[in-house]
Amino acid sequence: ITVEDHAIIGYDATILCHEFLQDEYRTGEVVIGERAMIGAGAVILPGVEIGAGAQVAANSLVARDVPADATVAGVPAEPVDRR
């Protein structure tokens, strides 16, 4: 797990580098970019990269990479408009 400068990880967030599934065992490096924000209770799955300045809403499940400066929310996490 790599957490870059000034990233914020909320209370009770879970960052996984490995995952046991019924028929497979997944592993992967997780990178939390500079100034990224992970909300409370969010779950980041193995192999995901959260880009610099990205935001993950509380209680979201992140299964795919999040681009820099994007905001994602939900289960599974999807991009949301930050108007």
Residue ranges, per PLM feature:
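Binuclear metal-ion centers of metallo-dependent hydrolases, dominated by the metallo-beta-lactamase
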Residues: 56
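Catalytic-loop signature of eukaryotic-like protein kinases
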Residues: 53
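Flexible, glycine/small-residue-enriched loop-and-beta-strand segment within the central core
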Residues: 1-50, 75-76, 80-83
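Acidic, glycine-centered active-site loop in nucleotide-sugar glycosyltransferases
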Residues: 67-68, 73-76
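Active-site-flanking alpha-helical
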Residues: 12, 59-60
